Amino acid sequence: MTRYKATIAYDGTDFAGFQSQTNQRTVQKEIEKILTKLNSFEPVILQGSGRTDSGVHAFGQVIHFDLKGKVRDLERLRFGLDTQTPADIAVKKVELVPDDWHARYQKHEKTYEYYLENSITRSPFQRHSKAYFRYPLNFERMQEAMSKLVGEHDFTGFTASGSSVDDKVRTIYQAEIIRLDEENFKFIFRGNGFLYKQVRNMVGTVIKIGNDRMPVSQIDKILTSKNRDFAGPTAAPEGLYLKEVKYAENTDI
């Protein structure tokens, strides 16, 4: 068996998330169908760097999988996967990795981006690719709130109640908001890991602060109290993208 690492992109609109689920269309199941075909119909189970929820997209999700036989030509394998997967999945790169390399458990950092349209009327052409908020937002307040998220914190207060992870301490290296134009914002979060719905809960809270319905100091209160009830609503999934996964062998993490 030979282990391969692949970088993939997908439009999450019509998926029930990344991870396999019974009677649901998922990214993992669609790719595994093609991998099994390429593996002489012997089942292949892939592993991802992490899950994304229904409606969430990815520019750079990373997976690994094992195929029997000799080492494949990497570009031919990438091309074979890319042309046989559905139109809402793209296989960007395939690499050879050691047999013990693991997409989830290798030390890595992740970058998420969140795109928000802020206008009186919503663009129908962006309804699957950006979230929407029609009310006024104070950019400076949102910048200040985002800066408070940087560093090592216990993010229990920004985690969905369904999280099964015991250790909720994570480090955020970058939390930034960029005004793309008069009607569009981009949020950037880069860290050593993120909890279930953490990014969307942070965005929902910052939006509420930007709309003057919470003080900037609410971020401190949420982090200190570890109480989800003090945070804002969970932001919509369509604005969220897994931008990049960087592993320790090619970064300074």
UniProtKB/Swiss-Prot annotation:
SUPFAM superfamilies per UniProt: Pseudouridine synthase
UniProt KW Isomerase keyword: yes
Keywords per UniProt: Isomerase, tRNA processing
Catalytic activity: uridine(38/39/40) in tRNA = pseudouridine(38/39/40) in tRNA
Example GO biological process: tRNA pseudouridine synthesis
Binding site for substrate: 112
InterPro entries in the cross-refs: PsdUridine_synth_cat_dom_sf, PsdUridine_synth_TruA, PsdUridine_synth_TruA_a/b_dom, PsdUridine_synth_TruA_C, TruA/RsuA/RluB/E/F_N
GO molecular function terms attached to this record: RNA binding; tRNA pseudouridine(38-40) synthase activity
Function: Formation of pseudouridine at positions 38, 39 and 40 in the anticodon stem and loop of transfer RNAs.
Family assignment from sequence similarity: Belongs to the tRNA pseudouridine synthase TruA family.
Full protein name: tRNA pseudouridine synthase A
Originating species: Lactococcus lactis subsp. lactis (strain IL1403)
Gene that specifies this protein: truA
